[in-house]
């Protein structure tokens, strides 16, 4: 991944690469750019807001994990805080294609798990597919969301998804990323399970009630969490495992370094992620133990 970032720097205009390199090559770079850093880059490069976001796309795409298609897509969302979050597409050998994560989903989930409660805009390499348009329509900020493509004028999400079907059509008022704190507790004293419960408590599952979360422990001791992101159209829903894998990817860590997993689900839910979670982790590393708890 670092070599891809270095390649992107080599291809970028000198004014951008000179000022961006200390940010993206820093040991603590977390695939985000603060509002202050973005402002400094604007001043240093004399690019417009739109031009700079588009110029940053190759750096987001550098995080892509696409062993099947070898087609690398980047996305950048701006959270309500003003911080930019990178995202990239993610595929898995030996697993059905339904487990694939699109760059837009990645960037949005990246922002969500880092505490954002909505996104203002998204910048992407290519026009969003119907799957991603529907995924974005679940967001708490869907009505205001703007989409920026290279060499195009900024357009609203609903320009790309007219007469949209969404949460309101099913009587749901709260969208994905809205600030929420469910009150699930678990008596297990396992620290990884408790991390999964924490993720569960911010999950979004108004259609199946399968509020759920996962925690993945790395060999290094780092723990990454994922919360379930359900969708009114069902199929674009993003399972908790994928949301956690996104955090691993954007942290520059490797999937083969996952040491253990813990999945926690609502016992009153109408579905379960257990089988798909086990099969996907099995494809990544058959030795990963999975703890499972219903609460």
Curated annotation (Swiss-Prot):
Residues engaged in binding substrate: 89-91
Annotated catalysed reactions: cytidine + H2O + H(+) = uridine + NH4(+); 2'-deoxycytidine + H2O + H(+) = 2'-deoxyuridine + NH4(+)
Any one Pfam family match given in the protein's UniProt record, by short name: dCMP_cyt_deam_2
The keyword Zinc appears for this protein: yes
One Gene Ontology term, aspect cellular component: cytosol
Keyword Hydrolase appears in the UniProt entry: yes
Top-level division of the source organism's lineage: Bacteria
Keywords: Hydrolase, Metal-binding, Zinc
Cofactor requirements of the protein: Zn(2+)
Biological processes per GO annotation: cytidine deamination
Residue positions binding Zn(2+): 102, 129, 132
GO molecular function: cytidine deaminase activity; identical protein binding; zinc ion binding
InterPro entries, A to Z: APOBEC/CMP_deaminase_Zn-bd (IPR016192), CMP_dCMP_dom (IPR002125), Cyd/dCyd_deaminase_Zn-bd (IPR013171), Cyt/Deoxycyt_deaminase (IPR050202), Cyt_deam_dimer (IPR006263), Cytidine_deaminase-like (IPR016193), Cytidine_deaminase_bacteria (IPR020797)
Record EC number: 3.5.4.5
Cofactor note: Binds 1 zinc ion.
CMP/dCMP-type deaminase domain segment(s): 48-168, 187-295
Annotated active site: 104 (proton donor)
Cited HAMAP family: Cyt_deam
Function as written in the Swiss-Prot or TrEMBL entry: This enzyme scavenges exogenous and endogenous cytidine and 2'-deoxycytidine for UMP synthesis.
Family statement drawn from the similarity comment of this UniProt entry: Belongs to the cytidine and deoxycytidylate deaminase family.
Quaternary structure and interacting proteins, as annotated: Homodimer.
Name the record gives this protein: Cytidine deaminase
Organism: Vibrio campbellii (strain ATCC BAA-1116)
Lineage, top ranks: Bacteria, Pseudomonadati, Pseudomonadota, Gammaproteobacteria, Vibrionales
């Amino acid at each position: 991944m670092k070599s891809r970032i270095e390649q992107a720097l080599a291809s970028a205009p000198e004014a951008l690469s000179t000022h961006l390199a200390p940010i993206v090559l820093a040991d603590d770079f977390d695939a985000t750019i603060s509002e202050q850093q973005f402002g400094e880059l604007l001043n240093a490069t004399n690019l417009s807001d739109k031009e700079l976001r588009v110029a940053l796309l190759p750096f987001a795409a550098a995080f892509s994990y696409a062993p099947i298609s070898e087609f690398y897509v980047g996305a950048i969302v701006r959270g309500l805080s003003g911080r930019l979050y990178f995202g990239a597409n993610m595929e898995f050998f030996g697993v059905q294609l339904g487990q694939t994560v699109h760059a837009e989903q990645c960037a949005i989930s990246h922002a969500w798990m880092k505490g954002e409660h909505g996104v203002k805009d998204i910048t992407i390499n290519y026009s969003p597919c119907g799957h991603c348009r529907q995924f974005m329509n679940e967001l708490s900020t869907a009505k205001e969301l703007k989409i920026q493509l290279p060499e195009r004028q900024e357009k609203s999400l609903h320009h790309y998804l007219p007469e949209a079907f969404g949460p309101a059509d099913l009587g749901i008022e709260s969208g994905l990323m809205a600030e929420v704190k469910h009150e699930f507790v678990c008596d297990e004293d396992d620290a990884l399970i408790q991390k999964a419960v924490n993720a569960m408590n911010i999950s979004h599952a108004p259609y199946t009630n399968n509020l759920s979360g996962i925690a993945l422990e790395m060999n290094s001791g780092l723990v990454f969490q994922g919360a379930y992101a359900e969708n009114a159209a069902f199929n674009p829903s993003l399972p908790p495992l994928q949301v956690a894998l996104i955090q691993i990817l954007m942290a520059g860590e490797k999937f083969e370094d996952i040491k253990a997993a813990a999945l926690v689900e609502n016992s009153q839910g109408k579905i379960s992620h257990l089988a798909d979670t086990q099969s996907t982790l099995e494809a990544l590393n058959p030795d990963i133990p999975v703890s499972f708890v219903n609460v």
